[in-house]
């Protein structure tokens, strides 16, 4: 019986791959169903022999209560975007300055959802969403229902891989036909449908919707030398990889590839929104490293956005958490990139003046980055005697006089007690990338603020269940959940708190770098501008902004209040002792290492307290140079930086 079960699992997985991945089935649906029913029956009789890669694991039936947060072992970075050939040429120049012979891998940018898959001993252990790059959601049960994701690898590997989960166009059309027949609201586009499906709590619905994946990265350390090798290895493990790709050292040839794909993309069975260009050599990738936000060795070219004409009916002016006043146009509704658009940003007053935008104008609307609707320009041939737009002199929230600082493009309200600014700051503090207080969205903030229950972020921690129950629409169950979410947020690692404070220029990635360095929010608040500016990837602008923020008396009072409510100020991620051998030193790895991998060398340096960066500068303390070291070694010699070899590192 056990042999027959093994045989059936092998056959059914092969037939499923032919059907879902290769679009080339070799057996009929009825033949597949017959074998599948046989396996189900055998598994009922012999549950002790059920294999981890059995296709029966993909069948629905589970109704999940929710999704738990998942800390990624290997962070998922965003990519720098490019919208023109000139930006790609500039990227090429930056790379070639370090590596004149660098070749690139150009791959399709699938319009889906990034997922991370972790296998332990070859068995799928965790499938998670990207989230903010550091913390995603555990959606393992849903990803088990995606038919081209292997539940079990042929080898007993411990590996984490990355890819894009998407909905093929054919599956998208079938879902919307069914929704139409049932009188339900249709999905706007395949990406929204894929996102909605992966958020389903009923795994049976996920199993029916025929999601698919393309894998593109091994996040865990690999012995492979190039991105091309990685893709071939992923395919050998049974993952789906995309074969529309090109390797070339010529950006002109990459551009020709982009133009060809853009012209033909409508014929692809899935949506794409651009081309990702990566340095093909993994060793070069390591040397180039990362900025605070993105890898220096990759760029995402985005196809030109779809454009439509619409009429501006009116303009709303709103003030954000930093006091910037943003104009938003109300439009005649148009269909754009799969959604109905009736509002679009006008950016700022300088943009309105530059484009001479007026109410009543017919304008060209597009989605910036395929996400945010924006006005591109005015169709002057359709203008009729519209008057120049009146720019507000007073804040739309508090009535204070607005200012337009020299060198800035935006109007700004500088009243610290402006109600809308306060509400926006409170909502930001509770948002997912900050303190992540579930249920504490803008509408709740509005109710609490209007009821005079909160006026600053410390007030959030004064709230009781009884306070929440005084609000319209809040029942005991909701109030209890929100209260517990507030209490749980006290235990967040301090970089979440720092980002939540909404300091100008200090994003989530910079917050993490700062807390990794200083370990504690109080220590950071007392740090000098020079010590902050010396952190690789940050600089003087962030240092000055932090110094200005922390020297305010009201900020010191706020930190005291947060301390009294037991809000955690410590960084909970991995840090190295200040007594470590290389503590505080900035080190660059360059050249080919013979006795250890680059990842092993990097990990050893970090464990010894060093900060490993990708570029040589005056801030670099030493470099470890292997064979064939290039421009980085030359630059280090010119700057008089200490140079060590691989043996020196091995002997530490």
Swiss-Prot record:
<feature type="binding site">
    <location>
        <position position="164"/>
    </location>
    <ligand>
        <name>NAD(+)</name>
    </ligand>
</feature>
<dbReference type="GO" id="GO:0046872">
    <property type="term" value="F:metal ion binding"/>
</dbReference>
<feature type="binding site">
    <location>
        <position position="395"/>
    </location>
    <ligand>
        <name>Zn(2+)</name>
    </ligand>
</feature>
<dbReference type="GO" id="GO:0003911">
    <property type="term" value="F:DNA ligase (NAD+) activity"/>
</dbReference>
<comment type="similarity">
    <text>Belongs to the NAD-dependent DNA ligase family. LigA subfamily.</text>
</comment>
<dbReference type="Pfam" id="PF22745">
    <property type="entry name" value="Nlig-Ia"/>
</dbReference>
<feature type="domain" description="BRCT">
    <location>
        <begin position="577"/>
        <end position="652"/>
    </location>
</feature>
<dbReference type="Pfam" id="PF03119">
    <property type="entry name" value="DNA_ligase_ZBD"/>
</dbReference>
<feature type="binding site">
    <location>
        <position position="130"/>
    </location>
    <ligand>
        <name>NAD(+)</name>
    </ligand>
</feature>
<feature type="active site" description="N6-AMP-lysine intermediate">
    <location>
        <position position="109"/>
    </location>
</feature>
<dbReference type="GO" id="GO:0005829">
    <property type="term" value="C:cytosol"/>
</dbReference>
<feature type="binding site">
    <location>
        <position position="278"/>
    </location>
    <ligand>
        <name>NAD(+)</name>
    </ligand>
</feature>
<protein>
    <recommendedName>
        <fullName>DNA ligase</fullName>
        <ecNumber>6.5.1.2</ecNumber>
    </recommendedName>
</protein>
<dbReference type="InterPro" id="IPR036420">
    <property type="entry name" value="BRCT_dom_sf"/>
</dbReference>
<keyword id="KW-0520">NAD</keyword>
<keyword id="KW-0862">Zinc</keyword>
<keyword id="KW-0436">Ligase</keyword>
<keyword id="KW-0479">Metal-binding</keyword>
<feature type="binding site">
    <location>
        <begin position="29"/>
        <end position="33"/>
    </location>
    <ligand>
        <name>NAD(+)</name>
    </ligand>
</feature>
<keyword id="KW-0235">DNA replication</keyword>
<dbReference type="InterPro" id="IPR001679">
    <property type="entry name" value="DNA_ligase"/>
</dbReference>
<dbReference type="InterPro" id="IPR004149">
    <property type="entry name" value="Znf_DNAligase_C4"/>
</dbReference>
<dbReference type="Pfam" id="PF01653">
    <property type="entry name" value="DNA_ligase_aden"/>
</dbReference>
<dbReference type="Pfam" id="PF14520">
    <property type="entry name" value="HHH_5"/>
</dbReference>
<feature type="binding site">
    <location>
        <position position="413"/>
    </location>
    <ligand>
        <name>Zn(2+)</name>
    </ligand>
</feature>
<keyword id="KW-0464">Manganese</keyword>
<dbReference type="InterPro" id="IPR013840">
    <property type="entry name" value="DNAligase_N"/>
</dbReference>
<dbReference type="InterPro" id="IPR003583">
    <property type="entry name" value="Hlx-hairpin-Hlx_DNA-bd_motif"/>
</dbReference>
<feature type="binding site">
    <location>
        <begin position="78"/>
        <end position="79"/>
    </location>
    <ligand>
        <name>NAD(+)</name>
    </ligand>
</feature>
<feature type="binding site">
    <location>
        <position position="302"/>
    </location>
    <ligand>
        <name>NAD(+)</name>
    </ligand>
</feature>
<dbReference type="GO" id="GO:0003677">
    <property type="term" value="F:DNA binding"/>
</dbReference>
<dbReference type="GO" id="GO:0006260">
    <property type="term" value="P:DNA replication"/>
</dbReference>
<dbReference type="InterPro" id="IPR012340">
    <property type="entry name" value="NA-bd_OB-fold"/>
</dbReference>
<feature type="binding site">
    <location>
        <position position="107"/>
    </location>
    <ligand>
        <name>NAD(+)</name>
    </ligand>
</feature>
<comment type="function">
    <text>DNA ligase that catalyzes the formation of phosphodiester linkages between 5'-phosphoryl and 3'-hydroxyl groups in double-stranded DNA using NAD as a coenzyme and as the energy source for the reaction. It is essential for DNA replication and repair of damaged DNA.</text>
</comment>
<dbReference type="GO" id="GO:0006281">
    <property type="term" value="P:DNA repair"/>
</dbReference>
<dbReference type="Pfam" id="PF00533">
    <property type="entry name" value="BRCT"/>
</dbReference>
<dbReference type="InterPro" id="IPR001357">
    <property type="entry name" value="BRCT_dom"/>
</dbReference>
<dbReference type="InterPro" id="IPR013839">
    <property type="entry name" value="DNAligase_adenylation"/>
</dbReference>
<keyword id="KW-0234">DNA repair</keyword>
<dbReference type="InterPro" id="IPR004150">
    <property type="entry name" value="NAD_DNA_ligase_OB"/>
</dbReference>
<dbReference type="InterPro" id="IPR033136">
    <property type="entry name" value="DNA_ligase_CS"/>
</dbReference>
